[in-house]
Amino acid sequence: PLNTSCQLDSLALRRTRLRSGLAKVIGFDSGTANLLIYIKGEGIVLNEPSVVAIDTDNKKVVAVGHEASEMLGRTPGKVKAIKPMKDGVIADFEITEIMLDYFIRKIHARNFLSRPRILICCPSNITPVEKNAIKEAAERTGARRVFLEEEPKVAAIGAGMDISKPSANMVIDIGGGTTDIAILSLNDIVTSDSVRIAGNVFDQDIIKYIREKYKLLIGEQTAEEIKIEFANIFNPDKKHKLEVRGRDLVTGLPSTIEITEEETEEALRESITKIIKAVTAVLEQTPPELSADIVEKGIILTGGGSMLNGLVPLLKEKLKVPVFIADSPLTCVVEGTGVLL
């Protein structure tokens, strides 16, 4: 018969195996604009804005996600809606931890028997300190283990690319905070770059343009609506107009103006030019054989920013290679985590 020590060891082993079997395996796309979660065996279970509303008087959380996002620019003085992620990395550690913990509890991914294993995507070319901050924030929510993977690699996998072969695949992932550009072959990144220009900067470009040209102040949500529903950066129509409402900076009163498609192209031109320069620099660093693959296969765009009207034909014209948008650009990264889990 087993002695007491052996019996205890055996029981501990069974408990460990049970907990491991019960533990959920989770993929996070913790973006600047939105946070998406994929659970192995279940698929995408959460897609919410990366926003937390805090009562500044007592430091209590008022809302997280969709509810908090609706408060942006509309909160009373004591309530502040915060975006804790900036440029794809943590800008406010404490609020990020609160947000991750809230979402993990919302999807019931943690219980007294088990702690989840988490795969989190992060932009390429971020600093070791920034990587450690992302990992630590996830660990402090009760994760058993946390793994990091570079976003362009995961986006490519989520877009359906086979990156395992000795052939080049190129992806441009334009999210809320960063644009990640990478050429991949044999399951690794051959050359890459990451610029902190993406959807949120596009919004700020539109706000700045309208403020400077028309002395009209508009909010982030209005700017985002203009970007998504009206802006055009390739052969824009100067006759196509949109009414925009905001606050007149001279009188302080509500006011309405009209802007044209051509003006949106002008507002976004500098940021788009910087992205194209970064893409060109990556292509210039690519070995000739892999360059030939890209000419044949083209470039795949992922992320919400890839849906900017006119971006595909503009990139085709500037880069002289085929350019395509992934089938599900908004969810490529989190779907890629699902393949890797």
Residue ranges and their predicted role:
Residues 1-174, 182-300, 306-341:
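Nucleotide/phosphate-binding catalytic cleft detector across ATP-hydrolyzing
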